[in-house]
């Protein structure tokens, strides 16, 4: 099902993102994983190549907060592979900071990584997917987007925004 599909997976160096990268590779996809730092991307790539040297996997570390850097990296991927079939927005940051210890900067940092970064990846990718006649965008969310959590208010708020983004994109792009 994923044979020869080209996928970008953000937050692909550890946890859910790394497991997603592995599953896509096991099913024949060509994967470009995004991570926050060169060292973590290179470490993940080395581990994946050690497990299966035949897997088609590469990595990049654009600042997901920078829409231009993200767009440039996504365009490079399109130029390399000729298409982008799947975007998995998995990069994110959890939080358990009590509200009385919050700052506006802390709240914005979480919203930026969990919501704005996804949009920064979606915008250039949607254009490519429309040009090629389709694609798939997956956004990682959390149950706390529905039920909240006892502290770290920005995390459930950000994941609620991701849900709204996902539902809106499905309604806008799904019919096409």
Q: Where are these predicted regions, by residue range?
A:
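Conserved glycine-rich Rossmann-like NAD(P)H-binding loop of the short-chain dehydrogenase/reductase
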Residues: 27-43
